[in-house]
Structures are given as C-alpha cells and as structure tokens.
From Swiss-Prot:
Annotated region (Interaction with 5' end of substrate DNA), positions in chain: 126-130, 232-237, 273-275
Localization, UniProt: Nucleus; Nucleus, PML body
Domain of life: Eukaryota
Keyword Calcium: no
Class in the EC hierarchy, top level: hydrolase
Protein name: 5'-tyrosyl-DNA phosphodiesterase
Keyword terms, alphabetized: DNA damage, DNA repair, Hydrolase, Magnesium, Metal-binding, Nuclease, Nucleus
KW Methyltransferase (keyword) present: no
Record note on cofactor: Binds 1 magnesium or manganese ion per subunit.
Biased composition (Acidic residues): 1-10, 21-33
Entry's Gene Ontology cellular component terms: cytoplasm; PML body
Free-text disruption phenotype from the record: Suppresses axon regeneration defect in mxl-1 background mutant. Suppresses the axon regeneration defect in sdz-33 background mutant.
Length: 362
C-alpha cells in the first residue's frame, strides 16, 4: 500500500516497538519437511435425486429438473446449481433467506497499468481459539508472527474472548473489526491504518448450527475500491450440505459485488473447510490464489497433521481447508504459508492451521 512517508514511518516504528515488547515469546523455527469423490457412477437415479436435494437444501422435484438436463451426472448438476445465475435466489434461500445487496460504487476504475508497483498482501488464519491449551502463549505467538509478516489485510477465524489481549494489541497497527464478539467464537478482519473503511456488515448463516457468518468490509486504498469477505464455513464432512450452500451463497455475493462495482478489488477467503470436490464453478474472473501462484504442493495443505501435531487425534490427515479467492486489477500473486514455527515454551504450534499469506500485484 502507498501513503505518506510520515504515516509509513510512524506505523513501522510502532511495529518495531511491539516486536520488542513481546520478545518473551520464543519461537523455534523448524525445518519444513516435505481426499473423497462423489460416488456418481454407483448411485441410482433415485439416490442422486435424494443426494442433490440434501446438499442444496432444495426438493427432489427441483433436483430432477436439473439432473435430467445433464444426463443424471450429479457432479455436473451441482456445478450448474452453484455456478448459474439462474439459481442465485434458490441458493440464497437455502442459506439465509433474502440477502442484502451491496450498494454500487462510483469509484474510478483502475487498470493493471495504473497500478504498476502497487502491492496488497492478505493473510488468513484460523487461530484455533477453541483449543484452550496454552492459549495465551499461542495468541502471543500469533500476534508476533503477524507483526513480522506485516500483511496489509488479515482475516482471522476461531477468535475467542478468552486471552484476546495479544490480538487486541494489534490495534496500534490495524483497524480491527469483529464479526460477533461475545459469541462462543467468531471471525475478525484487520486492515492497515492506511485502509479507508466505509462499511462493515455481518451476515449470519441461518442454516448454520456453528455460529458461522460472512463478514464483509468495504473501503478503499488510495482511491481503489476494495471489498473484503471473511468467513468460516461449516466444519466436518457430515455437514457438507450446509457448507456447500454457504459457499454458493458467498460466491453469489462475490458475483453481485463484482457486477455492481466494476474494477473493484475483491478478496474472499477464510477457513472454508472445503474438500476439492465441493468447489463449484466460481464466477468469471475470480481466481484461487494458491492455484494462480502455481499450485505448489509445498504450500497446498493448510491443515496438515503430518507436520502439525497440535491435534494428535487426527494424525494422518491433511487438507487445503484455508483458501483465498480474488478478483480485480491486481492480476499476479505470490503465495506462502506462515505460522509453521513451533513455540519453544509449550512445544506446540500457534494453531493447528497454517496461515495462508498472499501478495497481489500488477
């Protein structure tokens, strides 16, 4: 991001001061050591009707109207449902009823040429606040890593009230917006002081049994319109119907924002809990940051129990749960994982998830 030299120097001075203050958090850097399909062919047409209706929270008559048009291919039918504008209203109703619309922007449209030399970095991290073990130490480590990486924008999931102080202290560097503080757990969006915030919305998923929301922050960076969408979708394989419906709703919201705000920079991500086969067709022009950066297997798995032993009962599983999608005039991206350092004092990692960190540029 760009701003006046005085502002940049002031923020950098604060960041260095905070790094000194939390030097008691010792982090040992470790060397970096190096999942199910839809059973389409084995299912009867009746089973496909039932499965489609459950996943999409519709009925079997509706399911038949789509399945018969794609030769009863369940995967294709789900792609049609979640990717077509024609079913946006049905998808929205499945998640939460009628949704609010984002106001269109009158901001000037900037091209990649206009933004040469301009970069924006976005980090997303499920910080596992629900695990009470060594929580304060882990939150200090999270804050320590955030200050070292220094992203412009930070999405957090599984934030809890207990031992929140290290995260709250980041307000000297960031503007902090919580989704539903006081709830059992929630999300947060942190933005650089150079980000001009115009609006903050929280949409509660009515089909969620886990307090899940979509948090939306609208603002601008140096005249460039920016929308930030942070979410934590329904967890576990058995809650796939709710998760798929929530993901479809979020992508409809992204599509709506793009249509109403040409040239805006849109970031959508978080702990999506997605399996690859659950990803439906995303809107045109929207890219997956990890894929766009080259799909490096070294940075693929964000929940990896082979390398992260915080959740010992799940050893042997690794998933790409945490994802970041974007659209806009910044068309290139660099992608890394952060938070892979073990904390010396408690011999655990800051979270059971790695943080994803992406830098976007023209």
């Amino acid at each position: 991001m760009s701003n006046s030299d005085d502002e940049i120097q002031e923020i950098e001075a604060k960041r260095q001061k905070m790094s000194q203050e939390d030097s008691e958090v010792e982090i040992e850097i470790l060397d970096e050591p190096e999942q199910g399909k839809l059973k389409n062919s084995s299912m009867s047409d009746e089973q496909k009707l039932h499965e489609f209706a459950i996943i999409t929270a519709t009925d079997e008559a509706f399911a038949q109207s789509i399945l018969q048009d794609v030769d009863w291919d369940l995967k294709k039918a789900l792609d049609v449902f979640y990717g077509s504008e024609a079913f946006a209203e049905a998808r929205s109703a499945a998640v939460m009823g009628a949704s609010s619309s984002m106001a269109s922007s009158g901001a000037a449209v900037m091209t990649a040429e206009d933004l040469k030399g301009f970069e924006v970095s976005v980090m997303s991290w499920n910080i596992d606040g629900l695990d009470g073990r060594s929580l304060l130490t882990r939150m200090k480590a999270v804050a320590h890593i955030v200050k070292n990486v220094n992203p412009d924008i930070l999405f957090l999931q599984e934030v809890v009230d207990r031992d929140l102080a290290p995260i709250d202290k980041l307000q000297s560097l960031y503007k902090i917006y919580y989704s539903n503080k006081g709830c059992q757990y929630y999300t947060a969006i942190l933005v650089s002081k150079m980000f001009d915030v115009e609006k903050h919305d929280v949409i509660h998923f009515q089909n969620s049994g886990m307090y899940r929301t979509l948090q939306i922050l609208e603002g601008s960076i140096g005249g460039l319109k920016v929308f930030l969408l942070n979410t934590h979708l329904e967890s576990t394989r058995e809650h796939r119907p709710q998760r798929c419906a929530q993901f479809g709703f979020c992508m409809d919201k992204v599509r709506e924002i793009i249509a109403q705000n040409p040239g805006a920079l849109v970031f959508f991500g978080g702990d999506l809990n997605l399996r690859d086969e659950e990803v439906s067709r995303v809107p045109d022009g929207v890219k997956d940051a990890w894929e766009a950066a080259g799909s490096d297997n070294k940075t693929k798995f964000t929940w990896d129990t082979f390398k992260n032993d915080n959740k010992q009962g799940f050893h042997g599983a690794k998933m790409r749960f945490d994802r970041l999608y974007w659209s806009g005039p910044l068309d290139k991206v660099k992608f890394t994982l952060e938070g892979r350092q073990r904390i010396r004092s408690c011999l655990c990692f800051p979270s059971d998830h790695w943080a994803i960190n992406a830098t976007f540029f023209a």
